[in-house]
Amino acid sequence: MSSSRPSQSSTTSARSKHSARIIAQTTIDAKLHADFEESGDSFDYSSSVRVTSVAGDERKPKSDRVTTAYLNQIQKGKFIQPFGCLLALDEKTFKVIAFSENAPEMLTMVSHAVPSVGELPALGIGTDIRTIFTGPSAAALQKALGFGEVSLLNPVLVHCKTSGKPYYAIVHRVTGSLIIDFEPVKPYEVPMTAAGALQSYKLAAKAITRLQALPSGSMERLCDTMVQEVFELTGYDRVMTYKFHDDDHGEVVAEITKPGLDPYLGLHYPATDIPQAARFLFMKNKVRMICDCRAKHVKVVQDEKLPFDLTLCGSTLRAPHYCHLQYMENMSSIASLVMAVVVNDGDEEGESSDSTQSQKRKRLWGLVVCHNTTPRFVPFPLRYACEFLAQVFAIHVNKELELESQILEKNILRTQTLLCDMLMRVAPLGIVSQSPNIMDLVKCDGAALLYKNKIHRLGMTPSDFQLHDIVSWLSEYHTDSTGLSTDSLYDAGFPGALALGDVVCGMAAVRISDKGWLFWYRSHTAAEVRWGGAKHEPGEKDDGRKMHPRSSFKAFLEVVKTRSVPWKDYEMDAIHSLQLILRNASKDADAMDSNTNIIHTKLNDLKIDGLQELEAVTAEMVRLIETASVPIFAVDVDGQLNGWNTKIAELTGLPVDEAIGNHLLTLVEDSSVDTVSKMLELALQGKEERNVEFEIKTHGPSGDSSPISLIVNACASRDVGDSVVGVCFIAQDITGQKNIMDKFTRIEGDYRAIIQNPHPLIPPIFGTDQFGWCSEWNSAMTKLTGWRRDDVIDKMLLGEVFGTQAACCRLKNQEAFVNFGVVLNNAMTGQECAKISFGFFARNGKYVECLLCVSKRLDREGAVTGLFCFLQLASHELQQALHIQRLSEQTALKRLKVLAYIRRQIRNPLSGIIFSRKMLEGTNLGEEQKNILRTSSQCQRQLNKILDDTDLDSIIDGYLDLEMLEFKLHEVLVASISQIMMKSNGKNIMIVNDMVEDLLNETLYGDSPRLQQVLANFLLVCVNSTPSGGQLSISGTLTKDRIGESVQLALLEVRISHTGGGVPEELLSQMFGTEAEASEEGISLLISRKLVKLMNGEVQYLREAGRSTFIISVELAVATKSSC
């Protein structure tokens, strides 16, 4: 299927498409920038944007030189903003290789008087940076410059040797050099006395807490809260959240302003307003500040001997380009602060904990932008706090996107249901004449079906003449394609696109036969865009040539006036699915039978290996629970205990027989009743809480009745129908560790006695001082991580010890790093911290999962001097039990998915078989042929019944509802025997029907498909147990018992006899449910016997010399005509 903007469902294709769009957009950005540079004051913004948006190679630069020059200028500018100065150093010698022209004056206070003869500036190319700062400052700077992840130590506080003035040195590493931004510490500002992110995190603590307290489910609420918090934190006049759409254009989705400013909420702007190169820079340098767009830029002087040009991409001081400054001034924004919102891109790394797993791909979701009408400077610590806040915001955006993705998956499932529903109708007219119809399949403004030269239209569509025009165009220019999807018929080259007006811009069309087509239509994007910006005052006119938000909005509307909302990949998948179904609906029955055979082959492939795997896992799970050295107990849906293993009995002193039957809440401490009650209630709803701490009572003769403390995970027990039937609690006894921690918190003096104690009860403990340096690392941590105390002490806890790249203990991803920082920050600010799940890769590459508890360390005056972090590890048995549980769940889920797929795939060809049979029934058939069709119909009904069996437990437990249908035993018996004929013929087994004619023609009432299923299963088992050349016979009797004037109860007894040694005893034990493990055939017999029991019957098996017999008895009803 062709597409002017291809819609592919694969991730690789989507990325390729995205990369191609970025390259094309960068070329357009370069052309626009070149026009701006050439035009100067005569630059016409609106017309330039319109020109660059027009398709066609003639509009693009004639060569790559324009693009290369543009990218070089963006990345390697030679100017900085004047609110600070910049030095570039040789990484090995610490000598200056480049400096900004204002650096000598700012850092060495060069006199403005005329210098005396021979006087040289104190700072220039080749100067050793250590000579211009005080001794302690030079030492701190040298230590930072030798650091691996140098940016983790930002900012470094330094003092000039000549003036004593304090500066923040902000360092980052680029290829072959170190770049240092120096920003003066303002007189009113309390200088940050040590490096480390923790110092900045404190500034954003309130905002982070509010973001984390938000309920999920509303991206709008999340964005509104973010702009409100940044507004209060930074004090800018306007704060906005920009979101980038799939086609790279942007939209203001949240905004807050001071009174008197025009709102920009709802503003859409072209992709060129924030060029791709600028977006790349935002990914590298996530916070960007412009203090004064009118300030004169300062040149950077570079050593002429350098073999390369320095890049200032990572420098906050980097000067903005003139076109951006003009845009700012036109909108009366003199200063700005921009934070990048970077989220995960697509289906990347899942929950795998493999240490070799790469980090997730990232993409720029949007920006948080602050504007001010006057110059404004934000100190580095506050900018760092804003960057961290943006990372927390990005994590929540990720979660909202994942939630939207889940809703999307549900919509896809709904779509599949619609497709199946459409298939069962009169194809294809039912999909337009009934409800739901094809407009319910995807979001659209209109749809049409062209079938047998007739047009059936829904909603807003082209006229019949225009639609035939589109078909002719498709047939001429897309001959080899099965369809077309485009968001702009104009851009796709359809000659009559402009005549369609605003009603039809985008179209998805698919061919369903030689002359049959399906169409979906969308109107132009501008119809869905609403701008909440300021309205024009009477007499006011806009200058469209200037770069301004209102001009951007007009330019955006101009660009999209012939374009609709793009077709999503999942929408095209749904359309393709319907296309395939309709194209295949007319295939003959042989093709359907072939498909059915393939499905049956897949079913046969799903053999005993899956069941044995599940059974082995289940058996191992039961054994582990019974013998585990961790407490495990379980309750039913009423909260009454039905499981109580040896370890929990040992800890509580309550034997198993006394515990079973008690309500769980009667056994826990009063202080824990609410916690356990909530945990139990959520678990019964399927919401499994983890790492919940509560206390449970102890029993016994000893005087010590202190409760035991447990950390508990709830696991909902489910039946085959996925209904919750109970809750299993897997716990860990932390009484000893809790006592140690309680003792620790009470200690005022020698805490080292605990930290350095090698006793096995002491958990892994590490600590940090108030500046973020690792200050404690006990022997348990060394054993757990493989890193010695000397390896980690005096390293940055966040980044060097625990980080995402070159850290000792690597965290799984950036989200884990940010969450860890939030926990440490909250504890440092005095907040109570609950235990959280924590994980990292040890030195040997093994992933460690544990619970993290953070406690603040206080001095005698009560001031926070650092943090202690305790890790609680699950025991080996518990880890193994949880591992086995995960394996069991994964295996079960895998098998369920396969079964769900096969059940779904069976239904389509089955519907085709039914359709073919109905078509045959309408033809002239002989009596024998009609009988064959009736047998086929009986087998199809039986198969449908089995496909509907999603809850086997209901059958086993006797809760299945049986149907009451009128039938003749002859029809059921013939259909049952037909299912074994191929196998019996293959073994040359003779089938003898000893049923009397009267019995076969008796009219009975009951669940005939279920009776047929039962007989077919027992017949198959008998055939399997009969030697080749043997004999199988079927006989039966019917005993009637009148229970009313018009109804008689009938006891039907069917005997299936076969020669040979008989059915194996093991298989019979499985049928009667006495075996814990059952084979595929055993489960089939067990289900059949349970179905017989549901019919008030029973199954027996008799062995005789050389012959064995199944005796199946069931209760049915016989209807008699009442006398008139």
Swiss-Prot record:
Every Histidine kinase domain range: 901-1118
Region (Disordered): 1-20
InterPro entries: GAF, GAF-like_dom_sf, HATPase_C_sf, His_kinase_dom, HisK_dim/P_dom, PAS, PAS-assoc_C, PAS-like_dom_sf
GO biological process, one term: red, far-red light phototransduction
Residue ranges crossing the lipid bilayer per the database entry: none
Post-translational modification: Contains one covalently linked phytochromobilin chromophore.
Binding of phytochromobilin, residues: C323
SUPFAM superfamilies in UniProt: ATPase domain of HSP90 chaperone/DNA topoisomerase II/histidine kinase, GAF domain-like, PYP-like sensor domain (PAS domain)
Pfam families listed in its UniProt record: GAF, HATPase_c, HisKA, PAS, PAS_2, PHY
Keyword Repeat: yes
A GO CC term attached to the entry: nucleus
Domain of life, source organism: Eukaryota
Biased composition (Low complexity): 1-14
Chain's role: Regulatory photoreceptor which exists in two forms that are reversibly interconvertible by light: the Pr form that absorbs maximally in the red region of the spectrum and the Pfr form that absorbs maximally in the far-red region. Photoconversion of Pr to Pfr induces an array of morphogenic responses, whereas reconversion of Pfr to Pr cancels the induction of those responses. Pfr controls the expression of a number of nuclear genes including those encoding the small subunit of ribulose-bisphosphate carboxylase, chlorophyll A/B binding protein, protochlorophyllide reductase, rRNA, etc.
Protein known as: Phytochrome A1
Gene: PHYA1
